[in-house]
Every structure is written in structure tokens, then in C-alpha cells.
Amino acid sequence: MRRVHTGRALGFAATVACVMAAVLPRAQAFSFRSDSGDWAGSWDTTIGYGMGWRVSNPDCRLIAIANGGCGYSPNIDDGDLNYLHKTEYTKALTGVTELQLKYKEQFGAFVRASGLYDFSVMGNDVDRTPLSHEAKGVVGSYTRLLDAFGFLRFDLGSLPSELRVGRQVVSWGESTFIPGGLNSVDYFDVTALQVPGAELKQALLPDSMVVFNSQLSKNLSTQLLYLWSWHPDILEPTGAYFSTNDVAGAGSNQRVVLGFGAVSDMGVDFSPLGGGLVKDFQTIPRLPDHRPPESGQYGINFKYYLPNFGQGTQLGFYFLNYTSRVPVVSLQTGTPAGLGNAYGAVNSVAAAAQALAAGNSFSSAVQIGTAAGQQAAAATGGNLTAATAQQYATIGANTLLAGGNVNAQAANLATSEYSRTQGFYEEFPQDIKMFGLSFNSQLQSTGTAIQGEVAYRHDVPLQIDDVELIYASLTPFETGLANLLHEPVTGPGHCVPNSATPITGCNQLGSYYKTDAQGRLISQTVKGYALKDTYHFDLTATQVFANVFKASQAVLIFEAGADYVPGLEDKLSGGPQGFGLRFDGPGTNLSGNPNLGGYPEFPAVGGQCVASSVPNPHGQCLEPGAAFATTWAWGYVIAGRLEYNNAIGDWNLLPHFTWQQDVTGVSPGPGGAFRAGRIAATMGLTASVRNMLELDVSFTTYGGAGQYNLLNDRDFVAASVKFSF
């Protein structure tokens, strides 16, 4: 199950490009003023058209084995499969317009709206799975009201103050590119940044709040805010070009597919065994999300200016109580009916195969298996239909005739029956408390602008490895079925890999098997996260140069960031069972548990594990410990631009580049910023004339970190034109 690594970190390269574009001069807005001069306003509009093309071949490690690749998950590959042969992924018309009206600088209002229509998306121009109506509403066609607030400026005693009420964006801190810092007030649309020619203000989405600003003294100011609405971040929808999550985004498949890549999200065709297509084979369905209340978010900051420190230095102090905008995932164990039907499936397969082996005719063996399955299910709380029991009996008999493993087939079908009665859901924990410090200044000797911040968060929900969550959610099935089959049960914490209950004994979270007084299974919640304290550090330097490569001006920005999570449990010996506690990292589609690996056993493709995976003592593939979240993780971004004014007539030419590298460690999810070895680079050229017309063409490439870089094969070329008036 891959969930949230399509969050703020995904749009990293696009964010850099948008920020670099934001510092370009823009056209003067249409301004107006009343005859008296009391009323004044401005209206600014930008219309853009952009196209993007895929220019790299798909990486088989990011496509499930059952879908034609060599990867271990069918829950991340819809975006890849939709553009296997189709190179054009977007052809979008965009618009942003904003209107400001004010009276004597005392009060006024500001409104901003945006819109998008992507001809490629709306034309269902994909190779495999057309985007759903919900997904198209995110990346295909929409109009949005962004900011819409009123403001009042007044003196509170002798203190100049301002009150703003309504939908608005509040930016905190000093981070330029790297996410995870102090700028956590508003929510974010990752998809908006992937549109060629997009502007950052299209991705920073406002929430409804009241904001009070006041100048407490010559050098000290404060800001207080209270939010009365909440929205989650908008992630890439399932099937879009940049999507790496088929489970949780808009238009998702609404289910997690088990089987470590051996099972397709399109289902399993048992026709060769007489069973037909089973679309929901070994899937866990999605339950309704646990959405938080709208209220309960508030914060305050203070800014203090030191005029004599350097060339002037501003310090910032922050506090924010907020609700997570990126989801964590928890699971629900299955029902008594699911366990009963699983027992019925085992009996259908086994009885049919045994009857056939005993000399019965094929039709007679199927009848025996059908009856045995229904009786077993009914006796244990199940409701297996005659048609399903007959299907399983047919599969069991044909598996025997084909020389297959009847016991493994029975286990597969039983797992499928139980998993259908499970569930997973997203939740957004509340009352995360963030404390922060920031500074910005300028070095006297070189004129270099420097800025930095540190953000400390208390009770941050960190996502536990999803494979371990699934293992834990299957413990009632494993233990319950073993009891029904009168097999010995190994309890939690007593790891015997070759026993009847290896998951129960060896998984890192223990057993969730629980029954009532009548012995019926009780459904349990497998909490998908742990609350931890975290630190995020950020430092940025910006230098402007003259006469570089004959350019009018050159700008170079360097930003480094780091995440620190003290107290993470040992990955192999920590946690509640002493078998480790691993927090999720991107692309960890297998277990990191050396006692389980790819259980149910899934051997390596062609006898070899996919690169970076390693075999465990039982011949299965598993993830190395370095693939999961680490205590420290850090990376950096370098961005630069040359400016050639009037290079060709009135046209200005601006070559630009960005380089992003995650150096060491893995930031914990959801939405972790860093994954060691991951890189992204962009080179482009912008041409503008009279600050009204702008053309841009760029090439972006992703690399490093192997299958743990979920965008490793999404290199693209983008071109856009924008007209501002």
C-alpha cells in the first residue's frame, strides 16, 4: 500500500521552477481610481497554455509483475501504465485573475480565482485506465475561488494594526523550496505545480481564517490567526502522469491489492482453472475517511528587527496548533463472516481436490467441494454462496489436475475472502503543536542574503510501514483459520517462521486476534501511526552577480534542509514485540522483517531480487533497513538564473536551472522531504517581452535511489506561453 508520498515533496522540482519564475518582473495590473481619489483598485490577469511530454522509458521496478513489470506493488503504477506509449501527458489552458479594491488605504477587499482545462486529460488520452470524474476534477477541468477576504486598517491605541477576515494565504518562515518547515498554515495543491507555466499562487490554497497584525513598537510586530475551516492537501489523482498512488488519491481504486506484485489491480483471471475473472481478488477495500473537525487551528508569531546586526536582521518566533493536512492510514481487521468464508474456501478447494484424487468424477468432485465449502462457512459464521463455493471447488480440482499446489491455492482464496471484509481508511490527526524560530539578514562583505529557520513539532503522526500494518491486520485470519483447522498456534512475540502462524509470531505489531464470549471474531483497529516529536532545519543563501557570462544579472540560490526525529525505535529489535518498528519510506513495497520477507512467500523474479532488495534466510526478498525512515535525513537545492535584457530586440532571455539532491537518510512519512540518493534537475529558457508575454521551455530529469524514487522514470519536456494584462 503506497499512500502519501505524493504530497508536498513530490512537487519539489516544480516548486523551484515556480519560485524562480515568481521573481521575474510582471506586467502592470490594470489600475483604476475614483475622481475623488478615495477609491482605488487593480485588476491583474494571466492566461497560459502549456504542454508536456514524457521523454523517458518506464522503469519495470515501478510497475507490478502482474501488470507486465518487475515491481512488487500494483498500488503505485497506474500513472506509469497510462503513459507507457503515450508521450503527451498535458495540454492545458490556465488562468489566474485577481482584483483588489480599497478605500483610502483604510479598508478594502481582495479576490483571486483560477481555472484550468486540460484537453489531454479531458480527452481520455491515456493508454490504460481513463481518469475518473473525480480525478478529472483535480487535473482536468476546474474553476476555483482562491483568496477572498476583506481587510481593515486602524490604530489600536497608538499601534498600527490590520484585521483580515476570509479566505487567505498566510506564509510563515524563510524556506524557499524545501517543504516541512514553518510554512504550515495553508493547504497545498501538488497537481497545480505540475502544469507547465503554473504559478506558485495557484498551488498555495487559502483557508478561511481571521488574521490580526499589529506593530507593537518600531522594531516589533505580531500576527495572530484563527482558522475556522480545514482542507487536506490535494495530491496527484490516480492515473495522472505524476501519480504514484493508486490507493488514496482522487479517483483511486478504493482498495489495496495484496500479493506483492503477483496480483493485478485489474483482478486475477482463473479461467484456465475454470474459475473466471475475480476482480477483487486479495484486496482490502477503502472505508470512509476519518475527517477532523473544521475548528481548532490557531497560531501567533512575533517579528523583531535588529537594525544594527549585519545589514539589518529580522528574527521570527512562531507557534501553531494545527491539524495534519496529509493523511496517515490505519486498518480494520476482518469480520466473523470473512473468517467463516475463508474457512469455507479452504474446504471447497481441499474437498474437491481430495475427492478427485480419490477417483470421483470431475463433476462429482466439484459437487462435493461445493457442499463442503458452504457447510464449513455456515458452521463458522460465514455466508459463502453456492456459486462462489462451486467456483472455488472447480479451481481446486483443476489445480490438482494441472499439478499445482492445492494448499497454496486454498490459502490464496481464503486470504481473498477474509481481506474483502477488512478495510483501510485515512485520518488526519489533530493538535500538532509547532514552535519555530527564523531569521533573515544580509552579509555586509558580499551582499549575500541569508535566511534560515528551525521548526519543532510535538506529537507529529508518523506513518508505520504499511506492509507491517497489513501483516498485523491479517493476524486474526491466520490465528482463526489455524484454530479452525486444529493447527498449533504460535503466539505474538514467539517467532517461528515455518509454523502455521508465522505472521502472528513474527510481525512487529503483535496479534489483533480477539473473540467475544461466544468465540466470534471481534474486528479491531490497527493504528497506522505513532506520535513523535520532530525537528526541521533550513538554511538559504541568495547571491546576485553582475557581469557573469555577459548577462545583465545572475541569481544563485542555495538551500539546505534537514529532518531530525529523535527516539525512533530500532528497525530490527525495537517496537512492542522486539522485532523492530519500521516507519514508512517511499517505495518500500516489501517487508523489512527478516523473519517474514515477502510472506506469503513470493520469491525473486528469475531467482534475483529487484535491485536494493535483499534475500532473507528463507529465500524471499525483503527491503533493507536503509529504505525505511531514519533519525536524520538531509538534502539541498541549487537554483540559478541568468538575465539577458533586450537580448533580441525587446525580448529578454533568461536561462535557468535547478539541481536537487537528497544526500543521506529517509524522512518519515507522510510526505517526507528527503530520500537518500534521489535527485532532480531542470534546465530551461524563458523569454519575455515588456513583462506581458512570456515563453518557457524546459527539460526535467529524475534519478537516483532506484525503485525508491517513485518518479525515476518520469522525465519530461514542458513548454508554455503566458500573457499577463
Predicted segments with their positions:
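Outer-membrane beta-barrel "beta-signal"
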Residues: 713-725
